[in-house]
Amino acid sequence: MRTLTVVCFVALCLSAIFTTGNALPGELADDVRPYANSLFDELPEESYQAAVENFRLKRATCDLLSGFGVGDSACAAHCIARRNRGGYCNAKKVCVCRN
């Protein structure tokens, strides 16, 4: 039974290594623009830099990591990295940093 498991695992690894997949998207036509980047494409260079610096996902720390049980700890670490005195996840799953 153990030998069969090892053989299946090796076969799975080899198939994953040698399978040729294309992770890159195909060529887009000139008239088709991706909507996700349309805000950043239309901004001048100074505004683009400011938009990138101020882009925040406030719920990412508490929402995404709450499934692993480290939501509040990750929020506190995030706030300490921002030179605050810690933080917590509120009822809406938004990280709130203490001053």
Swiss-Prot record:
Hemolymph. Transmembrane segments: none annotated. Changing residue 26 to E: In isoform C1. GO terms for cellular component: extracellular space. Induction: By bacterial infection. Residues 1-23 form the signal peptide. Disulfide bonds join 62-89, 75-95, 79-97. GO terms for biological process: defense response to Gram-positive bacterium; humoral immune response; innate immune response. Residues 24-59 form a propeptide. Keywords: Antibiotic, Antimicrobial, Cleavage on pair of basic residues, Defensin, Disulfide bond, Immunity, Innate immunity, Secreted, Signal. The keyword Secreted applies. It is found in: Secreted. InterPro entries: Defensin_invertebrate/fungal, Scorpion_toxin-like_sf. Belongs to the invertebrate defensin family. Type 1 subfamily. PANTHER family: DEFENSIN (PTHR13645:SF0). Antibacterial peptide mostly active against Gram-positive bacteria. This is Defensin-C. It comes from Aedes aegypti (Yellowfever mosquito). The lineage of its organism: Eukaryota, Metazoa, Ecdysozoa, Arthropoda, Hexapoda. The gene is DEFC.
